[in-house]
Amino acid sequence: MKVLALNSSPRSAGESKTELMLNHLVKGMREAGADVEIVHLRKKKINHCIGCFTCWTKTPGLCLHKDDMTNELYPKWRESDLVIYASPLYHFTVNAEMKAFIERTLPSIQPFFEDCKDHTTHPLRFKHPSIVLLSVAGFPE
């Protein structure tokens, strides 16, 4: 199984509880035979989605931004069987780095809607990887 583990914590090793928890998860996955690559989003240049929909109209499936997301991360995401989104909990959700990554996967869906039983959705351009969310809150409760 090919796994891409995305760590969106802005903190480095030793300070990041997200990274600590992710490392334990990855260790177990590797012991079980998974091929896991960890990517620290804080070290990557990911421009924000600007909602231009070029990836749907002018260049279907391709974002107009030329950055680490387009050139490296999106292809790895597409080729993975499983992707781990590891993020600290900031203001009730994933942090801005992870949100930017997720928004930049917009080229992976098509611009029209289709009915799927009890809901309406955008059809996928290709089979998406399975997603696991590892959300970490550093406050003791």
Regions found by a protein language model. Give the residues of each.
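N-terminal beta1-alpha1-beta2 submodule of the flavodoxin-like/Rossmannoid cofactor-binding fold
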Residues: M1-Q110
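Short, glycine-/small-residue-rich phosphate/pyrophosphate-handling segment
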Residues: Q110-E141
